Amino acid sequence: MTTPASVDDVRRRNLATLLRLLHVHGATSRADLTALTGLNRSTVKTLTEDLVVARLARETAPVGRGGTGRPSITVEPESERVFVVALDVGVAHLTALRIGLGGVVLDRRDLEQGTGDYAVRRTLGRVVRLVRALLDGAPPGSRCVGIGVGVCGVVSDDDGVVRFAPNLGWVDVPLRALLADRLDTTLPITLGNDGDLGARAEHLRGVARGLTDVVYIAGEVGIGGGVIAGGRPMRGTGGYAGEIGHMVIDPKGRVCRCGRRGCWETAISEEAVLLATGAPAGTPLADVLTAYSTGEGWPRAGMRRVGRALGTGVANLVNVFNPQLIVFGGTIRHVFAVTEPIVRESLVGVLAASAEQVQLVVAGLGNDSVAVGAAELGFAALLDDPLGTMQGLPLVARTGA
């Protein structure tokens, strides 16, 4: 026999529903919150007052009448007071954002990583410095409710271990525990794969908002991806779905860092572009793409090969997932932008119905897709139990958290 929910359980669930709506939609009238939740007006009024007292939301009195009846009070999330630190740990870069409730980017720190300089201790030191800089810049009296981390590798959700990140050279790195120790914090730290988080961010706040079936492709040194199916992230057994960069498209191709031969990554990554075009090692990708798009001859043949390889992988993804949208993020969006006609030619061989339905677009959040997705990991505990999570969290002081 199922035990009926207690009054406290119902209240906690309703507060979570209300705060999640504010987090996703931003400023919303009480009348609209009533309609969206299906709760009565007095319940919504009480719940919003609870969120205001907890300093999770604020209410704004209506300026004037927009129609008949009494204008409804507007409720919005306290973006400046409640925030997370979101990290994108890439191969060539580190990005740290302070993101307020409601998805507002409040502050950022970016750092380029030197080629091959990915030792765990050194990378961890850089990440810790970025996090502390963001916390030091937070206004006094605000609260950090969590830290979300996107990593370009296979991540175990349960224990926060980076199982395999070939482009960083990491194997079984307990990143969550290491970060908690170095930051000396009890804040929840949650890790996720960069491709999964990029897909989540574009679905929640980017070009895929409102759609149900989306494939996100991103990369720089490596290629990753994430899939939204039926409006939900596709996790797979163990949460390792979406490693599309290691889809084999040429069994006789180059050896990948993962040890296999002919992975998609070996044909379309930044390194692959330089090799295909004959550009000297270390040449900025932007220089190669500019030369190609302006009609210079030297990169033409190589870029066409890259475009065909990109198109082959895209065609495979369309056939397998039948998405409404394929989103190109990271630096691969720039490769797609200059090879789009070649990529689209590859869709000729795709099942007609799938090819007609899919759209190919670049990421709406640009380079921030992964970090914005990581922020959602940081907010997860708060959105599940708003008042319980806020209890005991320290206020940010002038010199840090």
Residue ranges and their predicted role:
Residues 1-112, 116-143, 184, 252, ...:
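ATP-binding/phosphotransfer module of carbohydrate and carboxylate kinases, centering on a glycine-rich
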Residues 24-25, 205, 220:
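Short helix-capping/turn signature of helix-turn-helix
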Residues 63, 152-155, 220-222, 332-333:
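Short glycine-rich anion-binding loops that position phosphate/pyrophosphate groups of nucleotides
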Residues 76, 87-90, 208-209, 216-219:
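Short loop/turn motifs at secondary-structure junctions and domain boundaries
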Residues 100, 157, 228:
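Short, acidic, Ser/Thr-enriched surface-loop or helix-capping motifs
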Residues 105-108, 112-148, 153-215, 337-349:
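Glycine-rich phosphate-binding loop and adjoining helix at the ATP-binding site
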Residues 195-196, 223, 328:
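AAA+ ATPase active-site-proximal loops
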Residues 211-267:
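Glycine-rich phosphate-binding loop of actin/hexokinase-like ATP-binding domains
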